[in-house]
Structure formats: C-alpha cells, structure tokens
C-alpha cells in the first residue's frame, strides 16, 4: 500500500535525510522520513492492505527500515469526473486501489510532550480526491503553527470503495462500505502508532472540508469508529449532497449489475 509517486515540497528550505534521521519505531517496524524546515515528514505509510473489493487487513511486520519519503498511491480517479480532472491536472500521482496509506507531519518524535493529533479527510465526495491533491494539503505549516501532529489519509473511493457487489457472494458483503472501512482502519492504525510520532492517541481530532466533512459526519455515526477519535470538525460538509447518496440495497445492487454489464464482465 506504499506507492511510488512523488510530489515536490511546496515550501522552500533545506531537507535533511539519512540513515539516522527521522527514524520512528512502530510495532510493525522502523520507518524513515525526512526533516523539512524543522518538521519531521513521513509520506506513504501503509496503514492497511486489502485485496480488491475486500475489507482492509492489518499490515504485516517488516524487517528492514521502511522508507517513507514518497507520497503513496491514490485511489484511481474517473477520467469523466470534472473535479478529478481539475484537481489532478498538476503533479502526477500514481493511481491504484492499493492506496491504504497516510502521511504524517510532526514537530518531534519524543520530547516528553505528546501533541494533539489532527487527521485530515480530503474532499471530492466519496468519488474523487486524495490526501495530497493540493499543495495546501501539505501538513507542514499546520504542524508547525499549531504544534500538532498532522495526518492525511488516502482511502478507496468510487467503485473501488463503494460498489455494492453483495449480490454476487458473501465475500462481497462489505463492498459498498470499503472506503469507510479504510478510514476506520486508518484511525485504528493512528491509535496504535501515533505515540511513536509524538502524538497523543487520546487527543485525536478528525476534520475535513466538503466531501471530507461528509466523511467526518459518517465516522461520527459509525460504531466501529467509536473511541478512535475524540473531536470532530465539519467544514461545509453534509452526508447527502457531498458525493454521497443514501440508497436502498436493491438500488445499489442494480447499480452494480449495470456496471458489470457495461464492462462486459462475467460474474
């Protein structure tokens, strides 16, 4: 779930990187980031792994130090989605449904001062967007000015995260909600690991704008997310009308049927 796409830093300044710089030790293994303008930065950290149309699973432990220098994969974007075309006309970002990764910005790994954690959920509804679709989504400035640990999350969207294939087998019973399950998996990872990045797992705020605000509202009503965050900020979001429409299972299964028919896929 750790991709290979890159994005240049938005702010000028010297970058410090090396074998002994910005090493965080997590239960899964060591992670190496870099320091930019005195903020430790980690990109593309895998918080889960998943087979296509299947629920996320915990990542396996790794023996070597994992490099977290490059932004990870983002969920595939629809070429016909005008929002996606607008957002991704700039820096190239590698697209894959193997996109369960997050980015972290922190003032320090350990200085005897656990910091509040702010988890950014990107806009674009549940259809498009990514954790780093805009230079403004780089968390360095917020981490510095607010003295907080900032996390941004990529997760499955559109048909990769919300196509209801439940009519085609028990193994697909959760396929309509995989995007939300990814978000819960990210919050679980944060609860377990964020202390290793200087964050306070008992002081986590989720926040998002537009469709990201809708995700915040959705998580507030998701039982499996209970206890994984403690505060919420909704910026111009609504559950319906922000890329999300609540439909009956019969309707969502029909959408899946039409999708497979249009793709001429055997079931």
Annotate the PLM regions.
Residues 2-4:
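N-terminal Sec signal peptide cleavage junction
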Residues 7-177:
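Non-catalytic accessory segments of hydrolases
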Residues 127, 208-218:
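Glycine-rich nucleophile elbow surrounding the catalytic serine of serine-hydrolase chemistry
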Residues 67-90, 170, 174-175, 181-185, ...:
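Mature extracellular catalytic domain of secreted serine hydrolases
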């Amino acid at each position: 779930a750790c991709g290979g796409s890159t994005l240049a830093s938005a702010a000028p300044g010297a970058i410090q990187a090396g074998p002994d710089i910005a090493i965080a030790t997590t239960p899964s293994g060591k992670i190496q980031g870099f320091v930019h303008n005195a903020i430790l930065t980690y990109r593309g950290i895998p918080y889960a792994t998943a087979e296509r149309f299947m629920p996320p699973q915990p990542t396996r432990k790794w023996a070597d130090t994992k490099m977290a220098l490059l932004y990870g994969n983002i969920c595939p974007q629809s070429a016909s989605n005008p929002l996606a075309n607008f957002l991704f006309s700039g820096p190239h970002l590698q697209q894959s449904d193997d996109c369960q990764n997050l980015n972290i910005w922190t003032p320090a790994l350990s200085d005897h001062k656990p910091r509040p954690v702010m988890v950014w959920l990107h806009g674009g509804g549940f259809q498009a967007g990514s954790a780093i679709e805009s230079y403004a989504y780089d968390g360095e400035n917020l981490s510095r000015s607010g003295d907080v640990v900032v996390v941004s999350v990529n997760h499955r969207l559109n048909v990769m995260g919300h196509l209801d294939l439940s009519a085609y087998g028990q193994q697909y019973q959760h396929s309509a909600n995989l995007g939300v399950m990814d978000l819960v998996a990210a919050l679980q990872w944060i609860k377990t690991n964020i202390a290793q990045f200087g964050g306070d797992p008992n002081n986590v705020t989720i926040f998002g704008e537009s469709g990201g605000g809708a995700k915040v509202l959705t998580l507030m009503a998701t039982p499996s997310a209970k206890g994984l965050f403690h505060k919420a900020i909704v910026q111009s979001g609504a559950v319906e009308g922000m890329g999300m429409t609540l439909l009956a299972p019969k309707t969502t299964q029909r959408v899946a049927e039409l999708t497979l028919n249009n793709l001429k896929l055997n079931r």
